[in-house]
Amino acid sequence: MQITVSNLKKSYGGSTVLDVESLTFESGKITGIIGPNGAGKTTLLNIISGIDMDFEGDVEYSGSDYSEVKRDITMVFQKGGLLKRSVFENIAYPLKLRGTDKNEIQQTVVELMRHLGIEELSSKKAHKLSGGETQRVALARALAIKPRALLLDEPTASIDPEYMETIEKCIVDYNRKSKATILIITHSMDQARRLCDNIVFLESGRVGEADGFF
């Protein structure tokens, strides 16, 4: 899914926080979004994901609008955003909403838990999880629907290196297997170099030059 942003503007209280004339995220590529705090990175992902619909400009998804592709887009939030339920129930939730067969739900959830090393957490409640556990569950939940576009807001911020490696591997594996378009906000230049095919640099809501990062 190619995602194209045109003449995008977002304001809060009269102040422009995002002003992007033209930006294209290539289909099947992993794109890193970097920049200082307050640069508009999360705002951009919120708009692309459909969370924030109050903006000027256009966002196209391989020539379609959001209403036609919203079931194919999912986002992992910086703090997970899990429901107050068990790990299994969290991962299964989007599949249940879609009316997926119970046997398929069971198989999908078990496979994802195994892939992310969280099988032993199946019955554990979300509020009892560590930061690294929370992010792995959040990623599993996002991947359960097999999205064509996966948006990630600092998915490995402040977690142990071993969990970071597991999450990064899962992201890359999914991209290679599904050819999904993946956008990832990160403050780590090393992570951007490890994972990303392309880099977008945001500063004060505008796209800047990212030369020299690779």
Swiss-Prot record:
Q: Which species is the source of this protein?
A: Peptoclostridium acidaminophilum
Q: Which residues form a coiled coil?
A: none
Keyword Electron transport in annotation: no
Family recorded in the similarity comment: Belongs to the ABC transporter superfamily.
Pfam family for this entry, one: ABC_tran
Q: Does the keyword Nucleotide-binding apply?
A: yes
SMART domains per the UniProt record, alphabetical: AAA
InterPro entries, A to Z: AAA+_ATPase (IPR003593), ABC_SmlMolc_Importer (IPR050093), ABC_transporter-like_ATP-bd (IPR003439), P-loop_NTPase (IPR027417)
Q: Tell me the classification of the organism that encodes this protein.
A: Bacteria, Bacillati, Bacillota, Clostridia, Peptostreptococcales
Catalysed reactions, semicolon-separated: tungstate(in) + ATP + H2O = tungstate(out) + ADP + phosphate + H(+)
State what protein this is by name: Tungstate uptake system ATP-binding protein TupC
**Enzyme Commission number(s):** 7.3.2.6
Alphabetized, the UniProt keywords read: ATP-binding, Nucleotide-binding, Translocase, Transport
**Subunit details:** The complex is composed of two ATP-binding proteins (TupC), two transmembrane proteins (TupB) and a solute-binding protein (TupA).
Its job? Part of an ABC transporter complex involved in tungstate uptake. Probably responsible for energy coupling to the transport system.
Q: Gene name, please? A: tupC
Location of the ABC transporter domain:
3-214
Q: Which residues bind ATP?
A: 35-42
Question: What Gene Ontology molecular function terms does this protein carry?
Answer: ABC-type tungstate transporter activity; ATP binding; ATP hydrolysis activity
